[in-house]
Amino acid sequence: MKSSVEKLSETRVKLNVEVPFEELKPEIDQAYKALAQQITIPGFRRGKAPRQLIDARIGRGAVLEQVINDMLPTRYQQVVEENELVVLGQPHIDITKLEDNEVVEFTAEVDVRPEITVPDFSAFAVEVPALKSNDEAIDAQIDKLRERFGELKDTKRKLKTDDFAIIDIEAAIDGEKLEEATTEGMSYQVGAGDLIDGLDTALRGLKAGESAEFTTTLKAGEHEGKEAAVTVTVQQTKERKLPELDEEFVQTASEFDTVEELRESIAEQVAEQAKAEQATAIRDEVLKAALAEATFELPEGVVEDQIHAQLHQLLNQVGGDEAALNAALEAQGTSREQFDADNRKNSEEAVRTQLFLDALAEQEQPEVSQQELTDHILFTAQSYGMDPNQFITQLQQSGQIGNLFSDVRRGKALAAAICRVSVKDDEGKAVDPSEYFGEEEESAEESE
């Protein structure tokens, strides 16, 4: 077999392959054997008909078609390996010459990973937010717990932010009442801001039995974008009374006995969350710096595949209905054009990041243990809300376990590189990235 590689661009090559027929004997033998099992020729047992009779019955062309189908994947892969190409996606293959008993020639165009120069991470210096005092965060968590056990009490005063109200709403356009925008006896928290623009402003200062009128622009439904006159009437006003923060409440609302124990537990949770956020900030800043340093061309075919995959995923959520997708986007205050632009930008960023991390992993050569791979598979299954055994079965059937292995490998490579970066917080204090990304902290999730 003869082959050559023609460079079409930094990210695409064309393989020219010539295979003499004498090298195709295994595929030819297998093709005749398979076809002999599929046809019946009088006087011969199934599978025993001679080749010339098979040619006469179905034509030599059918045999050659089978041979071509069998030989293309293996010969293509052989050329890829011989030339040490890192191919991306599926090739576009054309049979350019077929001379029976002489030669088969074909070309294969395919995207390849561009040359990527991995920068020196030890030269990077990044700044991240400092770990702040967590008293406010602790108090906020305790208040959330108190709110879960709070009681709504009737009031006679004017409504203010965070109060609750039982309200009636009526909307009209040009004096015509809109049934779909009319409701009675609805509970609403003032300041929620998730119903109608202008509603919170109208409610503040009202008492039970009072009404207010305002004009708003409808953001969804048949009359989306139109101006509507809205009347809101308050039936009842309520405020949430929070329980006292004492031992009785703590014992009712948690597994702890004292307020001090509750605060200590929440403080630990808040501190861990703050550290996780700082670790994420370090990772993001380092990766941003590395990608800015390592500029390279993106393979357009891979980007297009990513764009189509994201679009397909979103379309599945609306039953594959393009019109429904466009309507949903408009309801969110955007457009299909903006979505497509954002999708392309995000897809390019995703492809650029993955290609860079693959190059980094080749440089770092991290080892991935079976336990690390298993942990990542279990973590991913949990994130999808799937049974781990069912998830593993799906991975095996679709041949996707290798992708998760690559996720872990990329994560470990990036973790090792981050440990060489100089990190300070925005208060000027040095931060040791190995506390987050050292060997004992490495995990598959760091690649997410």
Swiss-Prot record:
One cellular component term from this protein's GO annotations in UniProt: cytoplasm
Disulfide bonding pattern of the chain: none
Main location: cytoplasm
Acidic residues bias: start-end ranges: 437-448
One annotated GO molecular function: peptidyl-prolyl cis-trans isomerase activity
An example Gene Ontology biological process: chaperone-mediated protein folding
Annotated InterPro entries: PPIase_dom_sf, PPIase_FKBP_dom, Trig_fac, Trigger_fac_C, Trigger_fac_C_sf, Trigger_fac_ribosome-bd_bac, Trigger_fac_ribosome-bd_sf, Trigger_fact/SurA_dom_sf
Gene3D superfamilies the UniProt entry points to: 3.10.50.40, Trigger factor ribosome-binding domain, Trigger factor, C-terminal domain
Keywords linked to the UniProt accession: Cell cycle, Cell division, Chaperone, Cytoplasm, Isomerase, Rotamase
EC number assigned by the record: 5.2.1.8
Cell location: Cytoplasm
PROSITE patterns per UniProt: FKBP_PPIASE
Annotated catalysed reactions: [protein]-peptidylproline (omega=180) = [protein]-peptidylproline (omega=0)
Group of enzyme by EC: isomerase
Domain annotation PPIase FKBP-type: ranges: 162-243
Described purpose of this protein according to its UniProt entry: Involved in protein export. Acts as a chaperone by maintaining the newly synthesized protein in an open conformation. Functions as a peptidyl-prolyl cis-trans isomerase.
PANTHER family: TRIGGER FACTOR CHAPERONE AND PEPTIDYL-PROLYL CIS/TRANS ISOMERASE, TRIGGER FACTOR-LIKE PROTEIN TIG, CHLOROPLASTIC
Family per similarity comment: Belongs to the FKBP-type PPIase family. Tig subfamily.
Name of the protein: Trigger factor
Source species: Corynebacterium diphtheriae (strain ATCC 700971 / NCTC 13129 / Biotype gravis)
Lineage: Bacteria, Bacillati, Actinomycetota, Actinomycetes, Mycobacteriales
Gene name linked to the record: tig
